[in-house]
């Protein structure tokens, strides 16, 4: 009897002991997290957070940019919303966004680097670098892009050539249902390839197709649960399988692809006759034998080239996919565009950039596609470089800043029908009207450096396609504006019919 009672007490003590240990561990976790993430006085308000995961659980992972808006209504235009263990603040409204990106921009020039991105790029390249590295790389990239045609007739002719190839590829579909995704990707990517690599690829080139597949998959994987968890538990997840490992593998293969192109360039490189971005970068590297004093090194060459390749492909390609989808969904808009194209350009020649000023409706449609597509809903994040005071709130150094472009592009005070595709938003008395509350390329010193190129591509590609085809939904297939959330917001997979215009 005593033995039985003793065993029972021992079992009870074991259970209680485990519970006490668990409670102590949880208490310690909360206390450690509280001490680590203590906020200064006058820190922006926001929803409550949990240790490690922050406020992520408050947002719908399928549409975080939309579910965020409830907190804007509750807490105001400056609210705290921590992403995992990164202290973050969301800023809403054009006056505050302008203040951040113009008047106080020196305080917000840096980029935050998550553990995932640090593993991938280690603060190299153009997009996620900061400080001296960013200044050197951006200045060089802008100068080099201009030298190789940005804003010049030569690059416009390359876009026209690629638009011709895209039209021919779509014509080969014979009016049957097809997924436009990869043909558009190939066309857009070839423009930046001609600048960075000095050549375009044939659409059937297997290496080119694999490179685009790896990039597209990487964009989807980066927003996956395992990749987000890597930002919280990197030391554990580095040994576990999952989508994060596939992401790492994809970027390794992409870096290897760029490395091979660089090796080929070195074989016949002439510093006096640079052919493209890579040649120009190699020439810049040669000026600095001591690589410790400059960001012009092999790793930055690879990362900057990949940044140009990604930024020059993903964003414009995604916008073009939204454009064709909108044409199929809104045939009356497509008919008006075609009427304007026929009147200004006709069928006998290709569109060129000089046509844009004579085509206000087409220009308005392109801008409305960008507004409704809203492909980068939080903008590319910034980081507070020094302790900063904004709108009555204290923002400590290191805080991540997200600008709420979704609210800006769907503000009922700015847009007559904010949730509806309506090109009239960009028209006034039949003429194109610029809108201040429209920032698809951001603003300030860290605005998209390829904005001019992207605008040129969007006009020539979209106009060329609508000139030659009428896009329709396949029979018995319903299209919608449903989206897929990844690094960008893209349409869900769909098919279209491109009917040649006679």
Curated annotation (Swiss-Prot):
Binding site for heme: 448
Nucleotide-binding as UniProt keyword: no
Tissues and organs where the protein is expressed, per its UniProt entry: Abundantly expressed in heart and liver.
Record-linked InterPro entries: Cyt_P450, Cyt_P450_CS, Cyt_P450_E_grp-I, Cyt_P450_E_grp-I_CYP2J-like, Cyt_P450_sf, Cytochrome_P450_fam2
Pfam family, one: p450
Signal peptide interval: none
EC number of this enzyme: 1.14.14.1
Cofactor(s) named in the record: heme
GO CC term, one of those recorded: intracellular membrane-bounded organelle
Gene3D superfamilies cross-referenced by the UniProt entry: Cytochrome P450
Keywords from the named record: Endoplasmic reticulum, Heme, Iron, Membrane, Metal-binding, Microsome, Monooxygenase, Oxidoreductase
Catalytically driven reaction(s): an organic molecule + reduced [NADPH--hemoprotein reductase] + O2 = an alcohol + oxidized [NADPH--hemoprotein reductase] + H2O + H(+)
Gene Ontology process terms (BP): epoxygenase P450 pathway; linoleic acid metabolic process; organic acid metabolic process; xenobiotic metabolic process
Membrane topology: Peripheral membrane protein
Compartments, as annotated in UniProt: Endoplasmic reticulum membrane; Microsome membrane
GO molecular function: arachidonate 11,12-epoxygenase activity; arachidonate 14,15-epoxygenase activity; heme binding; iron ion binding; isomerase activity; linoleic acid epoxygenase activity; oxidoreductase activity, acting on paired donors, with incorporation or reduction of molecular oxygen, reduced flavin or flavoprotein as one donor, and incorporation of one atom of oxygen
Disulfide bond entries: none
PANTHER family noted in UniProt: CYTOCHROME P450 508A4-RELATED, CYTOCHROME P450 CYP2J9-RELATED
Role description: This enzyme metabolizes arachidonic acid predominantly via a NADPH-dependent olefin epoxidation mainly to 14,15-, 11,12-, and 8,9-epoxyeicosatrienoic acids (EET). It also acts as an omega-1-hydroxylase by metabolizing arachidonic acid to 19-hydroxyeicosatetraenoic acid (19-OH-AA).
Similarity field: Belongs to the cytochrome P450 family.
UniProt protein name: Cytochrome P450 2J3
Organism whose genome encodes this protein: Rattus norvegicus (Rat)
């Amino acid at each position: 009897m005593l033995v039985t009672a003793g065993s029972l007490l021992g079992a009870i003590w074991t259970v209680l002991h485990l519970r006490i240990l668990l409670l102590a561990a949880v208490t310690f976790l909360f206390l450690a997290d509280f001490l680590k993430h203590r906020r200064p006085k006058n820190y922006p308000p926001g929803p409550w957070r949990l240790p490690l995961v922050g406020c992520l659980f408050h947002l719908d992972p399928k549409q975080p940019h939309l579910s965020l808006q409830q907190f804007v209504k509750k807490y105001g235009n400056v609210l705290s919303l921590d992403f995992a263990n990164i202290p973050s603040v969301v800023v809403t409204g054009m006056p505050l966004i302008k203040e951040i990106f113009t008047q106080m921009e020196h305080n917000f020039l840096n980029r935050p680097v998550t553990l995932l991105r640090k593993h991938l790029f280690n603060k190299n390249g153009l997009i996620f670098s900061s400080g001296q590295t960013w200044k050197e790389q951006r200045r060089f990239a802008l100068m080099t892009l201009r030298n190789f045609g940005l804003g010049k007739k030569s690059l416009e002719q390359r876009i026209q050539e690629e638009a011709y190839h895209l039209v021919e590829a779509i014509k080969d579909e014979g009016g049957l249902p097809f997924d436009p995704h990869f043909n558009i990707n190939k066309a857009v990517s070839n423009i930046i390839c001609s600048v960075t690599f000095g050549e375009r690829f044939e659409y059937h080139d297997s290496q080119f197709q694999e490179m685009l597949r790896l990039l597209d998959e990487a964009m989807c994987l980066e927003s996956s649960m395992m990749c987000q968890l890597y930002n919280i538990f990197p030391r554990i997840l580095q040994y576990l399988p999952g989508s994060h490992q596939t992401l790492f593998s994809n970027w390794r293969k992409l870096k290897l692809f760029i490395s091979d192109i660089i090796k080929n360039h070195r074989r016949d490189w002439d510093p006096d006759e640079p052919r493209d971005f890579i040649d120009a970068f190699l020439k810049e590297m040669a000026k600095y034998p001591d690589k410790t004093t400059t960001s012009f090194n092999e790793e930055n060459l690879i990362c900057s080239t990949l940044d140009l390749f990604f930024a020059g492909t993903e964003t414009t390609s995604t916008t073009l996919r939204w454009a064709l989808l909108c044409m199929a969904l809104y045939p009356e808009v497509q008919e008006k565009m075609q009427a304007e194209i026929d009147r200004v350009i006709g069928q006998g020649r290709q569109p060129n950039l000089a046509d844009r000023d004579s085509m206000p409706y087409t220009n308005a449609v392109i801008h409305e596609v960008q507004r409704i597509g809203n492909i980068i809903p939080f903008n590319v994040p910034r980081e507070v470089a020094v302790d900063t005071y904004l709108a009555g709130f204290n923002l400590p150094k290191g805080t991540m800043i997200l600008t709420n472009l979704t609210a800006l592009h769907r503000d009922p005070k700015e847009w007559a029908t904010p949730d509806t595709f309506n090109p009239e938003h960009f028209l006034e008395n039949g003429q194109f009207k610029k809108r201040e509350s429209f920032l698809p390329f951001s603003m300030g010193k860290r605005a998209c450096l390829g904005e001019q190129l992207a605008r040129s591509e969007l006009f020539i590609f979209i106009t060329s396609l609508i000139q030659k085809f009428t896009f329709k939904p396949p029979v018995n297939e319903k299209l919608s504006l449903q989206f897929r959330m990844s690094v960008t917001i893209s349409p869900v997979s769909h098919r279209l019919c491109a009917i040649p215009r006679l």
